[in-house]
Amino acid sequence: MEQVNVTLTETIKVLLDDKKFSTLRDILITMKPFDIAAVFENLQDEKMPILFRILPKELAAETFVEMDDETQEFLIHGFSDSELKEVVDELFVDDAVDLIEEMPANVVKRILRQADKDMRKQINELLKYPEDSAGSIMTTEFIVLRPDMTAEMAIKRIRRTGVDKETIYTCYVTDANNKLIGITTVKDLLLAEDDELVKSIMEENVISVTTLADQEQVAQMFSNYNFLALPVVDNENRLVGIVTIDDAIDVIQEEATEDIEKMAAVLPSDKPYMKTSVFGLYKKRAPWLLILMLSATFTSAIISSFEAVLANV
């Protein structure tokens, strides 16, 4: 992760040591989750749970998602069941799936025990899709509208259900069989007359992908069309999820990391290249360097044994 302001990080450490938790909380709520997660990377292990418990519930979950796998696992081991449930309850389903895929079996069991029945069902559905497919990175938390709704009815539905959705700007219109027939935006709905029907507002020429589409292809579509979200459908064009821009960016980072590691002869890493420590890169590259060294030594020995012959040529 990028380093946050060093002075701010040191200030947070001092406030932790001095147990000035109220002041610390006031500072943390002004920071972005990504930057707070970066602070955790510079903390001693015993300080991490203390800082995490100071965070407001929603901010704590958002920060948790931005942490690296090792920090997440360390914190989970220190959580009580009720603390873990608070975090899990605040996670979007796709983030919960990402977390589960990176954790050991004993941690996964704890996470699933604390998830409610509906979330467990959604997690299990997403885990069925092949790795690196659109289905594996999509979320099932989005706004669905019906074509015969008025703009006023649609806005009311968004207000009523939007709080638990990963994105509400783009809304998806489906028929009675859940087949995707159009999309619209909150902006379009707000600018329409109250009694105007969704079917007269929506865009019918919808670009979508199937659940088995390669995630790299999906990420490329975000780049090509400047999407904020992309609908995912099954083989019968039924809407099953959406991929959001933040997940597409994660895919792009993963692919870039793989390309860099291949060029640098480095073993694959779970972390993006720019977030991996120098020691981590050394451990990944060392086996290849050892092989090259042995190969060079072997080649040199062969050449040396033929020096006399070569000298007479």
Predicted features and spans:
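Hydrophobic packing positions in regular secondary-structure scaffolds
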Residues: M1-L267
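Alpha-helical transmembrane segments and their membrane-interface boundaries
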Residues: D148, E258-V313
